[in-house]
Amino acid sequence: MKYADAGVNIAVADEVKQRIRHHANRTFTSGVLGGIGGFGALFALDNKKWKEPVLVSSADGVGTKLKIAMAMGVHSTVGGDLVNHCVNDILVQGASPLFFLDYLAMGKLDPAVIEQLVEGMSRSCRKAGCALIGGETAEMPGFYPPGEYDLAGFIVGVVERKKILTGKAVKPGDALFALPSSGLHTNGYSLARKLVFEVAKLKPDTYVAAVGNKIGAELLKPHFCYAPALKNIVARGWVSALAHITGGGIPGNLPRVLPAGVKAQIDLASWPVPPIFKFLATLGKIETNELLQSFNMGIGMILVVPPAFVKSVEADLKRRREKFFRIGRIERGDAGKPRVAHSGSLNL
């Protein structure tokens, strides 16, 4: 008996390595030592560029958005989403990405699908200036249903110790700015899929007039990467904190960067809610608090800006033609009370 008889095909694994090597090589920066295929990936930090470098790491996935990609046969988007999500996570602490690794597992290796996924990762890595230096592609027969896979990403970035964003500098009077999301990004898909495919019984290629798009394409919209838009703002020290709005929505993520004694006061009417969220809210008859905890509701990143830098941040974002909204402010908060309060109503 051979390994292939148990469902593991070494020849196909070798083909996969050859197909993805080119996409990884295109991301390599000056810090990369060696290439794809070693037992470990090597990266040399430029000591001349950094005085007191601190490495920042993060790991994440794209959740059940993968189910949408599998149903539509479009995989490069979620590959890119994985990188963008991780880049945004370390950006919150002021870090610039250095390198990225991925973990991909499926029951039977499909070289075409894997190449799509890695091509998407490669594209997002190049845009972020991040090297895709390695990963693991696992063939696990009997573990995943045919055509399904799981995907995770791991990123390492760097920030000067003195420039780490900890949130400790957040004070009452700071302004809250928000950058829009493209849609669900990579969170809330379990609820969205239940509403769309079980409650409404739609197909991925069903056109939804209220959304202005085929529902599958709408749900597969890419997760924005905010690093290019915020690079200068972060470098100049114009923010006291950043919050990436992912699982848990605004109430679940903004408090993670707020020190004790303060709260965020948000005006829910201060930004336009994308049609997809209005559609989902109507389908599920979802109340405001549940919406805010389940979805990003059109907000992908929140900036906490001291009063002295408000005009500078506004001017920088306008110069880059970035959409943004001023959604609230930081106020004094009491222990034991919610860290995020809101007024007004969502534009549903």
Please place each PLM-identified region on the residue numbering.
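Glycine-rich phosphate/pyrophosphate-binding loop regions near the starts of catalytic domains
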Residues: H22-S182
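A short, polar/proline- and glycine-enriched secondary-structure boundary/capping micro-motif
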Residues: L66-I68, G188-S190, F325
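Acidic, glycine-rich loop-and-beta core segments that form the ion-binding/anion-interacting portion
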Residues: P172-N213, A217
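Glycine-/charge-enriched secondary-structure boundary and capping motifs
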Residues: K2-G7, H22, V113-A131, Y144-L151, ...
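N-terminal amphipathic/basic leader segments beginning at the initiator methionine
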Residues: M1-S30
